[in-house]
A protein has these predicted regions:
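Acidic, metal/ion-coordinating pockets
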Residues: 1-194
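Non-catalytic terminal accessory segments
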Residues: 81-83, 180-182, 190-219
Length: 219
């Protein structure tokens, strides 16, 4: 459970852990062409839309306060890198908007993508599908947004529509620069996979995931 930009009024500290760094085992091809296994340190950081303070004022006012997405990322991502994160994935409940930046803006991810050190973004809130080459929504035609490849200012980004209709998948292609693993953006893929086939039948559920969510589905 991570949330970087919501703070406790009482303590002045983030309400939850702002980020977490996990070790992921990968299989790669070594310089000699042979398969090797390696560990990649992946940092995960998340953000809520600061406008929760207006939407849920009756419950939140006097208890918590928010910081802007951009300045929060600028604070914690260097710290994550200093603690060994080779990759940083930002999970942000917001969409894209190129209005002048404000710490209270609802959809601040266009600016989040410009913070150095963000390797991938999982975004949402505006209930749209990204990447989507056919989309005509203005925010997917902003400068630096590649709606076909799923890039926002060069950062691989996915928005998986709404109500579980799609599964957002970012396939980060990694290479080792001699010191650590880095993202090869030219070979990275982004897609939002629909849960329905062309004939309107549904894809088969993943057994492991189905087991994890069975109780919630039955509720």
């Amino acid at each position: 459970q991570v949330l970087a930009n919501v703070y406790s009024v009482k303590s002045g500290k983030p309400l939850f852990a702002p980020y977490h760094i996990i070790d992921k085992q990968i299989t790669a091809t070594g310089p000699d062409g042979k398969a090797i296994t390696s560990t990649v340190k992946v940092g995960i950081i998340s953000f809520a839309p600061p406008t929760i303070m207006a939407w849920d004022k009756r419950w939140l006012e006097g208890r918590v306060y928010t910081q802007g997405v951009r300045e929060t990322a600028e604070k914690f991502i260097p710290e994550m890198r200093a603690r060994g994160a080779e990759l940083v994935v930002a999970i942000s409940h917001g969409g894209l908007d190129d209005s002048p930046y404000s710490p209270t803006m609802e959809n601040g991810n266009y600016y989040l993508s410009q913070v150095p050190g963000v390797d991938a973004m999982l975004i949402g809130h505006s209930h749209q599908l990204f990447p989507n080459a056919a989309s005509t929504v203005p925010q997917f035609n902003l400068p630096g947004v590649d709606k076909a490849r799923g890039m926002v200012n060069g950062v691989p980004t996915v928005m998986a529509n709404l109500w579980g209709k799609h599964l957002g998948v970012i396939g980060l292609r990694l290479r080792h620069d001699g010191k650590q693993w880095v993202v090869d953006k030219s070979a990275t893929t982004v897609e939002a996979r629909g849960i329905q086939n062309a004939d309107k039948s549904y894809v088969q559920p993943d057994p492991a995931i189905a087991k994890l969510v069975a109780e919630e589905h039955a509720a």
